[in-house]
Amino acid sequence: CFMHPDQTRNTFAFKTLQYIEQSMAHWVMAAGAMPVLIPSPAGDTARGDITLADYADWLDGVVMHGGADVWPGSYGEEPLRPEWSGDRIRDEYEIALVKAFVAAGKPVLGICRGLQLINVAFGGTLYQDTSTQRPGALVHRDGQVYDQQFHTVKIEEKTRLSAILAGASS
């Protein structure tokens, strides 16, 4: 995730921050994997020549997790409302990250925004606001129950994901 410079923030107000949400890191660790932050190779402070392709060669896979909405321009649309502007800079970085891991033949797993971003990276589109564009859709942005929101997932047999999860079915 990115936090762009924000003068109202108490800590590192003038810095771009990248982070892994702790509960997401814990889920990855619970599966026996070691979470590693992959820093953006772009920006005013970029140094060195390590690329996203280098990370894709070095790591076993990547988990794309939640955060700000995907910028509508990433899938060829204009924002329907100004507050639905998403995060263009993060999108560009993460789309490049997805493409690097796919090019290296490594698995890419998306959770929430991450799944939406993978869809966009492969040319898909999104609803900008499910609550207004899909009446009756589930509300996913309730901070009180954030960690209790789950969806049942059916893992297709004989797929790369079923092999990685070794028999998981939901």
Where are these regions (language model features)?
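N-terminal beta1-alpha1 cap of cysteine-dependent amidohydrolase-like domains
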Residues: 1-109, 119-127, 131-168
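Conserved G/P- and acidic residue-centered "switch" motifs that form tight phosphate/ATP-binding loops
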Residues: 112
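The feature captures the ABC ATPase H-loop/switch
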Residues: 115
